[in-house]
Amino acid sequence: MKIAIVGGPTAVGKTDIMIEVCEEIGAEIISMDSRQIYRYMDIGTAKPTSEQRRRVPHHMIDIIDPDEYYNAFMYRKDSLRAMEDVLRRGKIPVYVGGTGLYADALVRGIFEGVPADENIRKELRELERREPGILRKMLEEFDPEAATRIHPNDLKRTIRALEVYMKTGRRISELQKEAKGDDRFFIIVLTRERYELYERINKRVDKMIEMGLVDEVKRLLGMGYSKDLNSMKTIGYREVIDYLEGKYDFDKMVHLIKRNTRHFARRQIIWFKRYKEAVWYNLTFEDVGEVKEKLKKLIVENFSV
């Protein structure tokens, strides 16, 4: 038995295509999106509509509040529990989403995280504040392999890697290698040519604005959720917050959301290219109807193995 993970960049059309595919084969969708896990954040995360969720049951959406902590290890545990529930009911589970880190957690495994230590994190943040760039140098010295995989500007993951090293004396890159992979999964990636994908992203952002993204952000802030939360730094939310604070005008806000989403989509494609065994479908060149038929066949046949 092989379970499909259908990934790809934002706005490529995963949701619409997979709703139809899963409806016809009697499958249920397990969301693989690190932002759709949050309640109250609907428009900016492009959650499936209530009508779509009626057509095909979805899991791993709206599971925590915006101020709650969540990580890839927790996602793996919770989503596998959801998968087993779907299997017990005689249905086909299909993972759908664009969060590559979650795909990694499923396929390659993830070590059981070392508990967070706020004292260490506070010390590291203060060190970085006093001497910008010092944490990057420390990471390159203590864990060169992790340094090659963590972007120089990704302070959060840099601090986490150093925290693990300081608490255990072991490199996070070594611990991650000890994690057990799971051969029950196979990966399908939906993509489009850059010009078409970027056009779709621009249109999606315009639609989000029309649907009330600004009001959604205002409502979240009104509920007491801080702009400094990880959830509120999601693309679309952070730009609206800066707009509401008067840092730039409305048109600049829209421009930045589009630009940042395009950059994010490019990073997603790069991430999924790491899966050498993945099956790719380029929706710019392939007929979408034919791709849907191929997906149905591929998902069902692999599930029946």
From Swiss-Prot:
User: Which cofactor names does the annotation list?
Assistant: Mg(2+)
Transmembrane regions: none
The protein's matches in Pfam families, at most eight in alphabetical order, are given as: IPPT (PF01715)
Which Gene Ontology molecular function entries are recorded, alphabetically?
ATP binding; tRNA dimethylallyltransferase activity
Q: What is its EC number?
A: 2.5.1.75
- Please give the InterPro entries that the UniProt record associates with this protein: Dimethylallyltransferase, IPT, P-loop_NTPase
Q: Where is this region: Interaction with substrate tRNA?
A: 33-36
Enzyme class, broadest EC rank? transferase
* Amino-acid positions noted as binding substrate in the UniProt annotation, renumbered to this chain: 10-15
Identify the residues that bind ATP. 8-15
Can you tell which superkingdom this protein's organism belongs to? Answer: Bacteria
Q: Which reaction does it catalyse?
A: adenosine(37) in tRNA + dimethylallyl diphosphate = N(6)-dimethylallyladenosine(37) in tRNA + diphosphate
Q: Which spans of this chain does the record mark as coiled coil?
A: none
UniProt-listed GO biological process terms: tRNA modification
Annotated SUPFAM superfamilies: P-loop containing nucleoside triphosphate hydrolases
Q: Which residues does the UniProt site feature Interaction with substrate tRNA point to?
A: 99, 121
Keyword list (alphabetical) reads: ATP-binding, Magnesium, Nucleotide-binding, Transferase, tRNA processing
What family is it from?
Belongs to the IPP transferase family.
Biological role stated in the UniProt entry:
Catalyzes the transfer of a dimethylallyl group onto the adenine at position 37 in tRNAs that read codons beginning with uridine, leading to the formation of N6-(dimethylallyl)adenosine (i(6)A).
Subunit (UniProt): Monomer.
Q: What is this protein called?
A: tRNA dimethylallyltransferase
Native organism: Thermotoga petrophila (strain ATCC BAA-488 / DSM 13995 / JCM 10881 / RKU-1)
